[in-house]
């Protein structure tokens, strides 16, 4: 197992907002993501919540703030997208992708440990008349070995769905407040290609 880790920092625009947090709950502005954090994602979930709140949850307020300082509405939207929203989405996407890659590596490692590759021979099946619990024990053993992988893949799928819902909702708000004919999700994909 390779010790993979990536550090992510919240966009500067989130760090300078007028949002205040109680003293007993410091805001999480930087996170180092590892396989262990993907398996137990409570800290990652907090960081993603912070990022989501700082952009998608308060998008109307953010757009209003940009509107005050800009004469041209299209420029305020472009500025908001490039400086705040798209970098935020990209960080969230990168965190989820990191855990997705870790899950794939976990599956490969577990397959090799369990001998589930088609190239290796599986342990012999025991006749149910000799040991009636053998099949169940074998299934439980395999399930236990794949538990962490299953947990991470379910977390990734759940967060991909959350991101899909948030980005489509945000795109609707952007179409109402900015340019109706823009495809903001395609623009985000291009933004990621340009900034990777």
Curated annotation (Swiss-Prot):
GO CC, one annotated term: mitochondrion
Domain of life: Eukaryota
Positions of short motif Cx14C motif: 99-114
Compartments, as annotated in UniProt: Mitochondrion intermembrane space
Record keyword Transport present: yes
InterPro entries the record matches: MIX23, MIX23_fungal
Motif (Cx13C motif): 178-192
Phenotype upon changing residue 178 to S: Loss of MIA40-dependent import into the mitochondrial intermembrane space
Statement: the UniProt record of this protein carries the keyword Transport: yes
Alphabetic keyword roster: Mitochondrion, Protein transport, Transport
Pfam families associated with the record: MIX23
Gene Ontology biological-process annotations: positive regulation of protein targeting to mitochondrion; protein transport
Induction per the UniProt record: Up-regulated by RPN4 transcription factor upon mitochondrial protein-induced stress conditions such as the accumulation in the cytosol of non-imported mitochondrial precursors.
Anything else known: Present with 768 molecules/cell in log phase SD medium.
Free-text comment about domains: The Cx14C/Cx13C motifs are involved in the recognition by the mitochondrial MIA40-ERV1 disulfide relay system and the subsequent transfer of disulfide bonds by dithiol/disulfide exchange reactions to the newly imported protein.
Main function: Regulator of the mitochondrial protein import machinery that is localized in the mitochondrial intermembrane space (IMS) and facilitates the transport of proteins from the cytosol into the mitochondrial matrix. Not essential for mitochondrial protein import but induced and required when mitochondrial import is compromised. Stimulates or stabilizes the translocation into the mitochondria of proteins such as OXA1, ATP1 and COX12.
Entry similarity comment: Belongs to the MIX23 family.
UniProt protein name: Mitochondrial intermembrane space cysteine motif-containing protein MIX23
């Amino acid at each position: 197992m390779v010790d993979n880790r990536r550090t992510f920092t919240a966009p500067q625009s989130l760090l300078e907002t007028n949002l205040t947090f109680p003293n007993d709950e410091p805001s999480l502005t930087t996170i180092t993501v590892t396989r262990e954090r993907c398996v137990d994602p409570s800290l990652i979930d907090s960081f993603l919540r912070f990022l989501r709140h700082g952009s998608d949850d308060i998008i109307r307020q953010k757009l209003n703030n940009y509107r005050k300082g800009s004469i041209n509405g299209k420029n305020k939207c472009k500025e908001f997208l490039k400086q705040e929203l798209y970098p935020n989405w990209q960080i969230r996407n990168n965190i989820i992708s990191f855990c997705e890659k870790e899950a794939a590596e976990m599956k490969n490692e577990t397959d090799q440990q369990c001998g589930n590759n088609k190239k290796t021979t599986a342990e012999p099946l025991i006749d149910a008349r000799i040991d009636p619990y053998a099949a169940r024990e074998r299934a439980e053993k395999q399930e236990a070995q794949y538990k962490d992988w299953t947990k991470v893949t379910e977390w990734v799928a759940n967060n991909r769905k959350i991101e899909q819902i948030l980005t489509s909702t945000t795109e609707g708000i952007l179409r109402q407040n900015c340019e109706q004919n823009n495809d903001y999700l395609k623009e985000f994909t291009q933004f990621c290609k340009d900034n990777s």
